[in-house]
């Protein structure tokens, strides 16, 4: 992306801020459904900053701009933010201020900080509002500046909705909704709004391609004791899918109708998952409706897999293993022959996977990092960075696939030929860390941070570490 475009967008945003009486604007990495993976339409943080990592927060004031991200993306962010107005803020590194701390220094007491409430969950908005207030700053739910400033903004995805057969789901949508209603009744709540796309897909037994590398549909679901409504754009439904959903007790209404329906929902109480329901939707419920804040009612049920799902996972792993072994058999001779690059081997691995039954696509963009590129967390080769593979050194390969009966993710570090002594040492130290971590016994309640010591111990003994 041309760096001058970022500068122009930041200046246009500052004019927007002047017009709306804002001293700063905050762009998170989320969408109205607060999922981990975001359709292009809502990638406003990437649009304003040029940084395309999956995690990060961009903040623009009238005079400065900064981007916060974690250690996975330090190297990528350093490169992508060069020659832009954005300074890199390294999260969880001593001395790095929080967004609120930085803003308190930049705009001072009484400053107005704008956010788009459609992409902040109720919990996130509440937490940021409190932290800003502690520093004497006000949080303002503003319009989405990208709505007017983002030229050629991608549309909200319109891919067709597909049914997920019970042969792979193991349980009908009608039965899942029945169980959800029982849980609502046990909580003495009349209704719930399901916002997370993976939870909507699981509950309604539907799949789609609205999110890159994820079989998801952009939709909401409203469930009461009397009805279940799937809010999804009409263009995505054919008659067969609509009829099948109706047979499961699911009515379909246009995606945008939720905004009109919530204020007249006619229930006295609703349970909202404050971590996935966006702030704007929470505001739309009528004042007489009691909002019961809580966690998701779907996630615990979705996490307990039935026998059909478990068998599906096993079968998917088996087929994916076949594809991986075929690829590994092909790889070394191909590298010795020459003309193989990070991108070419990624494509070849995808070819082997596509030969397997029930293959639907990649589960994420393949990470093929050769030599120094293997040290860049979440590295993604492109035409500019792509490099030739030689019959020496290490290739990091992190890849996976979506099958109709399961999802896979496998990482391997492959020696393409002769290794240097240091490469052997580093590989062995990492392997020892894996073994130590796999063998450790730990008490319930232990944290990942505590167990991380086991993974790093062998390296620390040799005076090396990783971020």
Which positions does each model-derived feature cover?
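Active-site neighborhoods and metal-handling regions in enzymes and metal-associated proteins
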Residues: 1-467
């Amino acid at each position: 992306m041309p760096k001058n475009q970022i500068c122009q967008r930041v200046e246009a945003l500052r004019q927007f801020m002047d017009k709306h009486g804002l001293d700063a604007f905050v762009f998170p990495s989320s969408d109205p459904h607060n999922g981990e993976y975001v359709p292009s339409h809502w990638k406003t943080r990437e649009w304003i900053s040029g940084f395309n990592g999956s995690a990060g927060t961009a903040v623009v004031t009238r005079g400065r701009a900064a981007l916060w991200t974690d250690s996975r993306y330090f190297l990528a962010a350093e490169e992508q933010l060069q020659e832009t107005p954005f300074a890199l803020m390294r999260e969880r590194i001593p001395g790095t201020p929080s967004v609120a701390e930085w803003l308190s220094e930049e705009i001072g007491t009484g400053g107005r900080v704008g956010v788009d409430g459609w992409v902040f969950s109720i919990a996130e908005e509440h937490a940021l509002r409190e932290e800003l207030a502690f520093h004497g700053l006000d949080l303002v739910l503003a319009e989405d500046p990208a709505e007017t400033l983002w030229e050629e903004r991608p549309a909200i995805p319109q891919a067709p909705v597909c049914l997920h057969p019970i042969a792979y789901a193991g349980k009908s949508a009608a039965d899942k909704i029945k169980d959800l209603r029982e849980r609502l009744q046990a909580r003495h709540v009349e209704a719930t709004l399901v916002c997370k796309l993976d939870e909507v897909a699981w509950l309604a037994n539907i799949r789609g391609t609205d999110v890159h590398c994820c079989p998801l549909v952009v939709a909401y679901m409203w469930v009461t004791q009397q009805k279940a409504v799937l809010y999804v754009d009409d263009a995505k439904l054919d008659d067969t899918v609509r009829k099948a959903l109706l047979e499961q007790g699911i009515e379909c209404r246009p995606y945008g109708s939720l905004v009109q329906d919530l204020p007249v929902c006619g229930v006295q109480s609703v349970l909202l998952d404050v971590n996935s329901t966006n702030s704007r939707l929470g505001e739309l419920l009528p004042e007489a409706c009691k909002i019961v804040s809580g966690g998701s009612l779907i996630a615990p049920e979705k996490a307990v897999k039935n026998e059909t799902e478990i068998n599906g996972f096993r079968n998917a792993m088996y087929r994916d293993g076949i594809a991986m072994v075929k690829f590994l058999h092909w790889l070394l001779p191909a590298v010795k022959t020459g003309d193989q690059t990070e991108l070419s081997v990624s494509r070849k691995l995808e070819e082997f996977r596509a030969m397997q039954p029930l293959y639907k696509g990649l589960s994420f963009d393949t990470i093929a990092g050769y030599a120094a590129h293997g040290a860049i967390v979440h590295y993604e080769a492109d035409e500019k960075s792509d490099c030739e593979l030689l019959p020496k050194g290490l290739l990091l390969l992190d890849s996976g696939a979506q099958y109709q009966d399961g999802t896979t993710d496998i990482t391997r570090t492959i020696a393409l030929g002769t290794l240097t002594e240091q490469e052997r040492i580093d590989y062995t130290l990492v392997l020892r860390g894996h073994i130590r971590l796999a063998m450790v016994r730990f008490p319930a309640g232990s944290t990942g941070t505590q167990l991380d010591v086991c993974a790093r111990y062998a390296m620390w003994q040799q005076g090396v570490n990783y971020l």
